Regions:
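Polybasic/polar functional segments that serve as interface/processing modules
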Residues: 1-91
Length: 91
């Protein structure tokens, strides 16, 4: 199933600005290099300089999915730029 988040155990917001030109491999490298984590059973969210678009990485049994969302209206995400701005997520 494409982008089935029912098996996700945790959601991680990657603080700061991410180069949104990065592909699946580039975003997976950030997860492994900066956080020493594997991508299994987690959803990782990234935001660039413009806070109107995000990317998500999710591993599924048959591959890795990258989800890209750009807001079409004049709006933006409130994205933490450093660890002091991080808040807990519930869903």
């Amino acid at each position: 199933m494409l982008a089935d988040v029912s098996s996700v155990d945790a959601i991680y917001i990657v603080c700061g600005r991410t180069d949104m030109r990065k592909s699946i491999d580039g975003l997976c490298a950030i997860i492994q290099d900066q956080f020493s984590m594997e991508i299994d059973h987690a959803l990782f969210l990234f935001c660039g300089r413009k806070c109107d678009r995000i990317k998500a990485i999710l591993k599924e049994p048959d591959g890795i999915v990258m989800i890209y969302k750009r807001l079409t209206a004049q709006g933006s995400y409130r994205w933490p730029r450093n660890k002091s701005e991080v808040r807990n997520l519930t869903w």
